[in-house]
Curated annotation (Swiss-Prot):
Ubiquitous. It comes from Mus musculus. Residues 49-428 are lumenal. This is Divergent protein kinase domain 1A. Its main location: endoplasmic reticulum. Coiled coil: none annotated. Among the many cysteines in the lumenal domain, most are probably involved in disulfide bonds.
């Protein structure tokens, strides 16, 4: 009896093992298929996103077609379209309409920017810049004199910057920049390129601040494509992750990761001083005040000497221009009165329209960005004072009495505190 039971058990065991192996095989195949499916989907989405965001070939074709037919001209045109010594490298675009690439021009590294597929009207919800027509580069027209072109540029600056007393000097500066071949004359093609570029706030700011340390230098242009000097580090933080990974990383943990991939504290302090100096540059400069409307780490970079360099200035806009466009905008709450990410005005509920006064000055937004950046790893002997000054800075309001005096005092105190601490360190 016992012997027969044992025999039955031995007979049943292979069937059990076979069933278990079949189950494991099916499970393995299912998970393998799932991995392949998810991986393929991620690759497809990444490729689709890349092809939508990164359209350098289309941009080059549009520009070069216009150059070869004599519509536009500029110092970068021949290198881009004939000798092909200006070429696009890594894509940095975050919007299809604003193409941005690391590039090389005659063996010199640079950043190439180009505008794509943009409508002619002003849309406050997206941009503060008039966009291309279907027929590109239509102004100035053939027969326009240099004097007439100067009047066009003057009127544009008056609309953007307000009635500044020295706009004529800026017009002459633009004519010098537009003369790409340095022959003392501005051709029609060069004028068309310059006019298209002057619609872009970043280009205008690069010209206005061309002698300032923290503004990238303009290397050249062709149409509304332009090349600016390269920046070695294109974010305050040294780690960039694929967007898929970003989805699964909690924001608190992401901030901790960011802090791990930053320079030493004295070097961070030097970068921070650079940002404070840039705020000074755009605050009541020679051609009015500019507002920083996207003060984020991704728009700031630095070079090998840890000098701050602006990477993206497209959301730095003339205050006069912003006020004129926002003041009659319909609103139901303050949330409707925002340009970029952090240029905010208030909503007047009696008229249901946005007011024109921006609430938070550039310095307060810069200090908000620098708070975590500087306090992490700050020397113990200055941490308390540094924190106190940063919070005083963040609390600044445009509407406060004697705001300009407070602005200057806080900015100078912060710079002095940081410089005193790093003046005698090798890292600075």
């Amino acid at each position: 009896m016992a012997r027969s039971l044992c025999a039955g058990a031995w007979l049943r065991k292979p069937h059990y093992l076979q069933a278990r192996l079949s189950y494991m095989r099916v499970k393995y195949l299912f998970f393998s298929w799932l991995v392949v499916f998810v991986g393929s989907w991620i690759i497809y989405v990444q490729y689709s996103t890349y092809t939508e965001l990164c359209r350098g070939k289309d941009c080059k074709k549009i520009i070069c077609d216009k150059y070869k037919t004599g519509v536009i001209d500029g110092p970068a045109c021949n290198s881009l379209c004939v000798t092909e010594t200006l070429y696009f490298g890594k894509c940095l675009s975050n919007k299809p309409s604003n193409q941005m690439y690391l590039g090389v021009w005659d063996n010199l590294p640079g950043v190439v920017k180009c505008q794509m597929e943009q409508a002619l009207h002003l849309d406050f919800g997206t941009e503060l810049e008039p966009r291309k027509e279907i027929v590109l580069f239509d102004k100035p027209t053939r027969g326009t004199t240099v004097q007439k072109f100067k009047e066009m540029v003057y009127s544009l600056f008056k609309a953007k910057l307000g009635d500044q007393g020295n706009l004529s000097e800026l017009v002459n500066l633009i004519l010098t920049v537009a003369d790409g071949d340095r022959d003392g004359q501005v051709s029609l093609g060069e004028a068309k390129s310059a006019w298209a570029l002057l619609q872009l706030n970043e280009f205008l700011l690069m010209v206005i601040l061309q002698d300032k340390e923290h503004t990238p230098k303009l290397m050249g242009f062709c149409g509304d494509l332009y090349v600016m000097e390269s920046v070695e580090y294109t974010s305050l933080y040294g780690i960039s992750l694929p967007w898929v990974m970003e989805l699964f990383i909690p924001s608190g943990f992401r901030r901790s990761m960011d802090q791990l991939f930053t320079p030493s504290w004295p070097r961070k302090a030097k970068i921070a001083i650079g940002l404070l100096e840039f705020v000074e540059d755009v605050f009541h400069g020679p051609y009015g005040n500019f507002l920083m409307c996207d003060t984020s780490a991704k728009n700031l970079g630095y070079n090998e000497k840890y000098d701050l360099k602006m990477v993206d200035m497209r959301k730095i806009v003339p205050e006069t221009n912003l006020k004129e466009l926002i003041k009659d905008r319909h609103c139901e709450s303050d949330l409707d009165c925002v340009y970029g990410t952090d240029c905010r005005t208030s909503c007047d509920l009696s008229t249901m329209k946005c007011t024109s006064e921006v609430i938070q000055p550039n310095l307060a937004k810069a200090c908000q960005l620098l708070k975590d950046y500087l306090l992490h790893g700050a020397p113990s002997e200055i941490r308390e004072e540094l924190e106190k000054q940063l919070y005083s800075c963040i609390a600044l309001k445009v509407t406060a009495n004697q705001m300009e005096m407070e602005h200057s005092l806080i900015l100078n105190n912060l710079k002095t505190l940081l410089w005193k601490k790093i003046s005698y360190t090798n890292d600075s």
